[in-house]
Regions:
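N-terminal J-domain/J-like co-chaperone modules of DnaJ/Hsp40 proteins
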Residues: 1-55
Length: 55
């Protein structure tokens, strides 16, 4: 996954700060977490995007 795609998945601009990445990841995971009946596909996408952006 590219950094640009990771920003797109997390609904952020490419100049987002580390804190904004964390906040977006947390917000989105609360919506799609598999333990809450959400999608494992989207959870994996958000996890990968966070890993790409935060290392």
């Amino acid at each position: 996954m590219t950094r640009a795609r990771a920003f797109e998945i997390l609904e952020l601009s490419e100049n987002a700060t580390r804190d904004q990445v964390v906040d977006a990841y947390t917000r989105l995971m609360k919506q799609v977490h598999p333990d809450k009946g959400g999608s494992t596909y989207f959870a994996k996408q958000f996890n990968e995007a966070r890993e790409v952006l935060l290392g």
